[in-house]
Amino acid sequence: MAKILVYRWKAYNYIDVMSTFAKLGYEIDEISQPLMNYDVDEEFGEMLRNKIRSSVYDFVFSINYFGIISDICQDQDILYVAWSCDSPMISMHHESVYNSCNRIFVFDRSNCLEFETYGVENVYYLPLAVNVDRINTLLSTAYEVNSASFYENDISFVGSLYERNNYDEIYENLPEYLRGYFDGVIEAALQTGENGLHERMLTPDVLNELEGCFDFVQSSQRSFSNLELVFANNTLGFKIAREERIRNLIEISKRYKVGLYTGSDTDELIRVENRGPVDYWKEMPRVFANSKINLNMTIPNIKTGIPLRVWDIMGAGGFVLTNHQLELDMYFEDGKDLVTYSNNHDMLEKIKFYLENDSLRNEIAARGADKVRKYHTYDERIKYMLQILKDCK
């Protein structure tokens, strides 16, 4: 029997990926020791080396990429396979990505193209997926009658509002010119919906001025991330996501009932019903299945890829209304499998239309669910991954 060694951490889709490997005949050993440092961690390194030497493994696997695991696999002459579920992966901007042991799969095609321009080999595009069987099993079981109102919505949104974003923390320390400039950048990104606009606005002059007031510390001497990458994604990206989510929810709630499932502070959203966070495994699919419209707002850090949330909604048979992402066009028909919006006004118009057209809305949700069940399961993704590994030998 084929055997793999897996680094386990709290990734949402970990169980789905592992159950798929098991279904395909793999014996799975796990390590789960927390990493104190993604670059150098002697205790973790010793543990991983000993584990690799203790048996014969086809490869070491992790969800998301870890440079320290890659270096150890390179040293131990064993294949390291990683499937990125975050975007962008700052940890991939590390010298270890050039290790020959790596087979790195990324769900955002733009990241794949980016690393190809760096001359990194063995980086492959692999979209995320959904475990339809698991979700259907959950949805086939009854829940308490008094729970129905918790799950049922005209419009629902599940996700963070990013109130603890780095931009708000540093805002008052920025020079007045930069505050005004970034306020304009954020507003332009929100008004146009243009992906990557905030990155292009980080000109050399702006970055030079930012260096004097933004505490950027390289995480490692082997890292090739920079101020532009970190500020665009970890700072501006999450701020734009917060503003988009707050503004959209406020506008929607002026007209319709909105159920929000989040652990974030919602004091600004006086008309929105905050139902608190939901469990990814036991509750979230029920929200998607029982909401007339499931709203997705992709964080700007995901440039072209399809976030896990879209797959999860469609896998539960839910109707998806989402901002447009380039890769959606590769797999789905807008208005047939799901519906996209281009800006706030377009979103409100489509909410109105689809709330008034139940049969069309249900038809789109059913067609989308059928498509992901046929073509976008973890079985399909892992089989494709294994074929790539076979072809690369």
Set out the residue ranges of the language-model regions:
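Short acidic active-site motifs
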Residues: 47, 69, 92-93, 282-283, ...
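Short, conserved loop/helix-junction motifs that constitute active-site signature segments
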Residues: 73-75, 96-99, 148-150, 253
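Nucleotide-sugar donor-binding catalytic core of glycosyltransferases
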Residues: 2-14, 121-302, 325-328
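Catalytic binding pocket for nucleotide-activated donors in carbohydrate/polymer assembly enzymes
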Residues: 5-8, 12-15, 19-24, 29-36, ...
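N-terminal pre-catalytic "stem/leader" segment of glycosyltransferase-like enzymes
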Residues: 1-77, 230-234, 258, 378, ...
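Nucleotide-sugar donor phosphate/pyrophosphate-binding loop at the beta->alpha transition
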Residues: 81-96, 106-107, 134, 229, ...
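Active-site proximal beta-strand in glycosyltransferases
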Residues: 73-88, 103-106, 125-128, 156
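Histidine-centered beta-alpha loop that forms part of the nucleotide-sugar donor binding/catalytic region
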Residues: 64-65, 84-87, 109, 127-130, ...
